[in-house]
Amino acid sequence: MTVGRYGLVAGVVRISDKLERIENLLAGSDRQVDDETLLDSIGDMATYCIMMAAECMAIAMNVPDTADTVDNRVLVKLLFDTITNEIDRLCFPVPNAVADAKFLFNRMELSALSQDMTEYARYSGTYQYARMLAAHMLRWFVYGSVG
């Protein structure tokens, strides 16, 4: 999300796009990507909502737009190392090959998402956002839901 450049309207646009995509999937419209699922779109929308909530907190707390400090990098890295270790602890041992493949796929997605998250957290300077998204990611990848 490009909140820094366009303000909170960037989040509203992304959430609106995802909501429209969800409505289309529910209506049975053609998928834009072959393996696109309703659950993927809902997860994406939840992530954008968390990003907006954290951005609102950062605005309320007067967090500077650029807070790329060594301390922030260390905190964000520690957070994602912790969440990755927790996922490892909860998911192993995996009883069969299908579950194993699914777990590895989720870990790859988690890794990509955590890299995006780290970049966003550096830019926005809001560690709170990283904490919120990490909690969301743990629920999503381990328990299969955000609720």
Task: Pin down the residues of each PLM region.
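Intrinsically disordered, low-complexity regulatory regions
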Residues: M1-G147
